[in-house]
Structures are given as C-alpha cells and as structure tokens.
C-alpha cells in the first residue's frame, strides 16, 4: 500500500514550500487544466521510483488553549492515520513553545516521526541539531526546502522504513511494453486486480450520501460474496456480483450489514480517501447536488486526476430539486469541471435508487478505456490525421514535426509522440491532440497523458575513420594551405 506522510509544524516553518517541492505542484499535470484549484493540502509524490502521499496538516499556533484546541480535527486525524510524520521546525527562529507542544503530542501518540530542521541555508546544521535536541525526537535532519538542499537524505530516511511493495504490484499505471501486432484489434491489458473484478472507490466530502450509495449498490438483487476487512486503516474491500459481473467496492466508512444500517454523520478521513483512490481502478465521485461544486470537491477531483484514475461523477440528492435549481447546477458543472470533462456525470438519488443502475455502465466503459491498448500504426495514423487538420506552430522559423506515436502505458493511457522540437509544443496543442485521441478512440471516463520524445541523430557521437587516400589528400591540402599563407606573409614584407 502507498505510504502516507504528514507534514506537521507551526505556521511559517516552510511546510507549504516542502509540500510543493515534494509533489512538484507547480509542474503537476493538474496545473495545466483551467478551473482546477492549485491550493491543495494533499498530493501524490514520487522519489526514485517510489510513490507516496503527502498531507500538509496546516499550522499549529500553540497558544494557552493547547494543541487540541488549535488543530483542526482533520489535522489531528491525518496525524493519527499517517504512516510517518515529518515535523518541521524553523532553524532561524529556534525552538519555541509551540514546537515543544507539538513534539509532546507526537511522543504521546508514539507516532513514527522525523524532526526536520528547515531553513539551514544560513545556519550551521550542527547548531540546528543541538538547538532542537531537547524535543526528544532524535537528531534533526537539516534541509533548505526553498533550495532543495537535504531533501534526498530526508526522503531516504523517511521512506526507508517502508517495504518496497508499491502500487505497481496491483497492476496500476503499468507499462504497455508488449507491442500490439500491426492489424490486431485493440486489447485489454490484464492485471491482477481483475480477479476480483473492477475495484471501485466511492469517495466525496462528508455527508454527500456515500454511505447510502454503498448500501444501495450492495442492496437488493445483488449477491454479496463475502465481507473482508482491508489491511489499511479499516477500509473494507467488499466483492459483489451484479449481472454476472464481479466488482469490489472499497468502502472507507466501514461495513454496514443488512438489518443494522443506520444513517449517521460520516467521519471523513483524508487518508482513507486518498488511499482508496490509489487502490481503485475506477473512482465514483459523489457530490451533493443541492450544494453544487465547492472547493473541497475540486481538491479531491484534482487528486483523482493527478493519480490518473478512471472517473465517474454522481450528483446525489437530485430528487426534490426544482427545475431552475437543476439548470443552475448543470451550468456550474459545465463551468467549473472543465478539467474533468472526460468523465460521465450521473444525476442520482442514492436514497431512492434513481439512476444508480446507470453507474455500472459508465464504470465498465471507463475501466475498458483505461486498460485498452492499440497498435503503433493506429496511434500514428490518428496523429498524422490530426496534424493534417491542424499543424503544430512554427518555432524559430521551423515547424514542429511530430513523426509517430506509440502506447507507453495504461491506466491511464500514456501516448508517447516522437518528433523534432517537441519541447516547444504548446499546451493548447497537446490538449488538441488529447481531444482528438479521445474522440477517435472513443475513450470515456479516463484521463489521457501525452509524452513527447525528441528525435535522436543516429550519427551523433560517431566519427568515420578516414581511408589512406583521404588522409593523404588532407595532408596535401594542409601543406598547400601553409604554403599559400607563407607567400602572403612574404608579399607583405
């Protein structure tokens, strides 16, 4: 399972800077989409081929009311459920009362914590270690988050406590290294996860109806094969069958057995939600139609997009809304969810079951789109047609040339395009190619990623050896050139 690391510390110690450094937020895929908020508190990060989740828990002021009063409930919960904590302190400011309170809280929870002394670019690291040694959390790891100093050593220590069994074993984001023979029909890339059917994570903000939807999907006319507790913080993996198709629901709210179902205020868990997204094949994102699109929805959708999961959106509590309210909500969806316009949107009532059955068709189509592979000839043909309709722009008087394309991975589909001057391809043209591939290949519910590779000169670095005749000719030319230069000098005298 993907490890979760929480960033903890008082305000202005550099947590956001470190978060951006680890998740590469400014360069993230999600930043290229209009309408998507970039102010996120959690994100996916990679280091030396390993994937992990980072959570910024927010600042802790540590006044007389104490840590529990000043930390938001979600921050405390994130610390409790995280696999490890990076506790940031400010080397320039020195140790404060707030630092001592946070350290005491972490010691009481017996949480695996790493003390991180930030802003050591102008401070002696040894002095910083000595300054914060009374906190009782071991030697501080010195870093300068703004400049990237010490980050590799910090990650080596923090990630070194986790086994190297990341998500690739689940068949996620797998490369499509086997070439499809020319003329073959597109095929699905099988993965170990298919044994229990399509894994579906139902996520969303608190009290949007996730529990009701889970109960509805596991309700009448469904056969629950068995209930099995997952290994990650009480998340439940529930395989079930519908119309002779196998599915596995990843339920972050716990099992609700028949006869014991009751509605209660959900305790939202960021950690469970993010890990459910990572482990799923398809995400059903539940929103409250009466509240419309809120910032928290955009944050979670941004993480889904960043991880590349197939996506289906369900607008719950649609029944009972007036026609004018429905029209307004649809307008807001079109305006604010442009960055996930590939996802099917369903208007449902989980309580009454209206529209719930249609979710399965979208789940199957999204999964099929995410794991299908196509031959190079097919992808190249689509590229050539797209270039013929709309050519890439000119750069320094030369037009960008896109030569051929092949599949570089699946779930989500990764299309690798080779050509010249590919570093100068505008984002708008990349979006044009994405839409073209989506339309021609009839892809639904999955993001597409396009990667460019520049053409390599086959003669670069190679040097032909001269023949004996060429060597003699070169010598004669050099001798003739020297004699001519000598005559010119003699005439000047």
Swiss-Prot record:
**Keyword Lyase part of the UniProt annotation:** no
Spans of biased composition, class Acidic residues? 167-184
What biological process terms from GO does the record include?
ribosome biogenesis
Going by the UniProt record, its keywords in alphabetical order are: GTP-binding, Nucleotide-binding, Repeat, Ribosome biogenesis
Enumerate composition-biased segments (Basic and acidic residues): 454-463
**Signal peptide interval:** none
User: Sorted alphabetically, which SUPFAM superfamilies does this protein's record hold?
Assistant: P-loop containing nucleoside triphosphate hydrolases
> Which residues make up the binding site for GTP 1?
9-16, 56-60, 118-121
Task: Give every KH-like domain span.
Answer: 372-456
EngA-type G domain location is 3-166, 198-371
Could you say which residues bind GTP 2 here? 204-211, 251-255, 316-319
Stretches of Basic residues bias are at 471-493
Q: Which GO terms describe its molecular function?
A: GTP binding; ribosome binding
Which superkingdom heads the taxonomic lineage of this protein's source?
Bacteria
What are the start and end residues of every segment in region (Disordered)? 166-195, 454-493
Q: How does it assemble?
A: Associates with the 50S ribosomal subunit.
Role according to the record: GTPase that plays an essential role in the late steps of ribosome biogenesis.
Q: Entry's HAMAP family?
A: GTPase_Der
Write out the similarity annotation: Belongs to the TRAFAC class TrmE-Era-EngA-EngB-Septin-like GTPase superfamily. EngA (Der) GTPase family.
Protein name listed in UniProt: GTPase Der
């Amino acid at each position: 399972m993907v490890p979760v690391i929480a960033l903890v510390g008082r305000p202005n110690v550099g947590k956001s800077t470190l978060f951006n450094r680890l998740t590469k937020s400014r360069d993230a895929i999600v930043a290229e989409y209009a309408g998507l908020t970039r102010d996120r508190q959690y994100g996916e990060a990679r280091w030396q081929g390993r994937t992990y989740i980072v959570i910024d828990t927010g600042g802790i002021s540590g006044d007389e009311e104490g840590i529990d009063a000043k930390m938001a409930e979600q921050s405390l919960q994130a610390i409790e459920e995280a696999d490890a904590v990076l506790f940031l302190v400010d080397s320039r400011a020195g140790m404060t009362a707030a630092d001592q309170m946070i350290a005491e809280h972490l010691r009481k929870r017996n949480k695996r914590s790493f003390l991180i002394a930030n802003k050591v670019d102008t401070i002696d690291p040894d002095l910083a270690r000595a300054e914060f040694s009374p906190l009782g959390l071991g030697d501080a790891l010195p870093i300068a988050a703004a400049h990237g100093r010490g980050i590799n050593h910090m990650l080596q220590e923090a990630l070194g406590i986790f086994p190297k069994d990341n998500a690739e074993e689940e068949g996620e984001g797998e490369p499509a290294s086997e070439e499809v023979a020319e003329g073959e029909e597109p095929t699905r890339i099988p993965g170990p996860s298919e044994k229990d059917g399509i894994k579906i994570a139902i996520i969303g903000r608190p009290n949007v109806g996730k529990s009701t939807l889970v109960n509805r999907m596991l309700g009448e006319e469904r056969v629950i094969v068995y209930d099995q507790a997952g290994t990650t913080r009480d998340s439940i993996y529930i395989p079930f069958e519908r119309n002779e198709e196998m599915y596995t629901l990843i339920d972050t709210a716990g099992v609700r057995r028949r006869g014991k179902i009751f509605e209660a205020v959900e305790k939202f868990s960021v950690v469970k939600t993010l890990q459910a997204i990572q482990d799923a094949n398809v995400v059903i994102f539940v929103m409250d139609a009466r509240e419309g699109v809120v910032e928290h929805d955009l944050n979670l959708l941004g993480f889904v997009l960043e991880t590349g999961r197939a996506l289906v959106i369900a607008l719950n509590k649609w029944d009972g809304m007036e026609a004018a309210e429905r029209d307004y909500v649809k307008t807001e969806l079109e305006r604010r969810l442009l960055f996930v316009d590939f996802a099917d949107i369903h208007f449902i009532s989980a309580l009454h079951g209206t529209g719930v059955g249609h979710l399965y068709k979208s789940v199957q189509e999204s999964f099929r789109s995410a794991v299908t592979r196509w031959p190079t000839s097919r992808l190249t043909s689509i590229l050539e047609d797209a270039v013929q309709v709309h050519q890439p722009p000119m750069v320094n008087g030369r037009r960008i040339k896109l030569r051929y394309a092949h599949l570089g991975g699946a779930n989500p589909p990764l299309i690798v395009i080779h050509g010249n001057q590919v570093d100068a391809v505008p984002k708008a043209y990349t979006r044009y190619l994405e839409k073209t591939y989506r339309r021609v290949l009839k892809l639904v519910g999955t993001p597409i990623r396009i990667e460019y590779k520049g053409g390599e000169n086959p003669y670069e670095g190679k040097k032909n050896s001269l023949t004996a005749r060429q060597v003699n000719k070169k010598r004669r030319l050099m001798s003739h050139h020297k004699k001519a230069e000598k005559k010119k000098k003699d005439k000047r005298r």
